[in-house]
Swiss-Prot record:
It is a single-pass membrane protein. Residues 138-181 are annotated as: Disordered. Keywords: Coiled coil, Membrane, Transmembrane, Transmembrane helix. The keyword ATP-binding does not apply. It holds the Pfam family NFACT-R_1. Belongs to the CCDC25 family. It comes from Dictyostelium discoideum (Social amoeba). It is found in: Membrane. InterPro entries: Jlp2/Ccd25, NFACT_RNA-bd. Residues 1-34 are extracellular. Residues 52-206 are cytoplasmic. The gene is ccdc25. This is Coiled-coil domain-containing protein 25 homolog. Its main location: membrane.
Length: 206
């Protein structure tokens, strides 16, 4: 079971698992467009923000970042009781699992690809609005990821085919122009030869 929430202005979707075991599937089948959020040094929900195509985690609007942090803090048993917490976030692709790690536990491939939001305090107004958008879904995470990858491969093939057609057209246009230049050059050469060996006799016109 996955919980989905709608963030606004601009609109984004974020989601989280209901327990640490489901978090394992979220880690396994996350998307390259996803950004992972967690309360630093405390147990909490794993919240994922899904970016739009072409965006990077550096493009997250400040208000959307705040809403993600509020959602993470609210869904931490200990964190929600603290006056303030630090939130850690990183691209999904930077999450690392190793043998023997507990369910829901993660490391990072690159510590430099990790950011923090310090001293996050509860904002009840934001929490109340987000909670109203809560939607619980039964999701086949593996199927969704496979569909996403299939669509991406289709788009890449389409782009490559369009590129090949454009390159072919450009090549044909270039060849056409070169053929025209060659033809023009040949005609000029032939005219020069004709004029050289066939001089006009003015008496012919008298």
């Amino acid at each position: 079971m996955v919980l989905y929430f709608k963030l606004i202005d601009p609109e984004y979707i974020c989601y989280m698992g209901i327990d640490k075991f489901e978090n394992e599937d979220l880690i396994k089948y996350g998307w390259p467009e996803d950004v992972w959020f967690h309360v630093n040094d405390l147990s909490s929900a794993h919240v994922y923000l899904r970016l739009r195509k072409g965006e990077t985690w550096n493009d997250i609007p400040a208000n959307i970042l705040e809403e993600c942090c509020q959602l993470v803090k609210q869904n931490s048993i200990q964190g929600c009781k603290e006056a303030s917490v630090d939130i850690v976030y990183t691209p999904w692709a930077n999450l690392k699992k190793t043998a023997g790690m507990e369910a829901g536990q993660v490391l990072y491939h690159n510590e430099r690809e990790v950011k923090y939001v310090r001293n996050v305090r509860k904002d009840s107004k934001i929490i109340n609005r987000i909670e109203k958008t809560r939607e619980k879904r039964e999701v086949d995470l593996m199927h969704e990821r496979d569909s996403r990858d299939k669509s991406e491969r289709h788009e890449k093939r389409k782009e490559q085919e369009e590129k090949r057609r454009a390159e072919k057209k450009a090549y044909e246009e270039k060849q056409k122009m070169e053929d025209i230049k060659k033809y023009t050059s040949i005609m000029k050469t032939d005219n020069m030869k004709f004029n050289k060996y066939n001089p006009t006799d003015e008496d012919d016109f008298m």
